Regions:
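Short, basic/aromatic recognition patches that contact phosphate-bearing ligands
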Residues: 1-92
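Bulky hydrophobic/aromatic content
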Residues: 81-141
Length: 141
């Protein structure tokens, strides 16, 4: 198999794909994972992916769950640092806080949403309105 130009970043891209594209409800097959890596111009062998999954668990604490459904094997990230409910709580607190500007709120929420998969991030796209609450204009926080 020919090597892609970003081959040295294979592990990083694989970890990014697994964290962004998978969760308890969304899994990927090995072929889908390889297709996602090809978007980054990275090629990989099946066995190297398995070894990388083991390294993710051993060295970074990112548990990759393997599920057999019919004839297909699916993979997804197990537990994360923050549960979806905790991320929602943080976002609600940011949005309802009067001392954080709207711009800073958007920036913080974008960062907090990176703790969950893109599917879960889409679920928490919501606005909290506190009647009579005025956001500060002070950008120095």
């Amino acid at each position: 198999m020919s090597r892609g130009t970003n081959q040295k970043f294979k592990f990083t891209y694989l970890m990014q794909v697994m964290l962004e594209k998978t969760d308890d409800e969304h899994s990927l097959t090995l072929n889908q994972i390889l297709e996602e890596l090809e978007k980054y111009d990275v090629t990989a062998e099946r066995k190297s992916i398995y070894a990388d999954f083991q390294d993710m668990t051993d060295k970074f604490g990112i548990e990759i769950i393997k599920e057999q459904i019919g004839r297909e094997t699916y993979y997804h990230v197990g537990s994360r640092d923050f549960e979806l409910a905790e991320v929602k709580l943080l976002i609600d607190a940011i949005q309802s806080s009067k001392f954080i500007t709207e711009r800073k709120s958007r920036e913080l929420i974008k960062k907090v949403k990176s703790f969950v998969s893109e599917y879960q991030a889409n679920q928490i796209q919501r606005q909290v309105y506190v009647h009579g609450r005025i956001k500060t204009m002070n950008e120095s926080i």
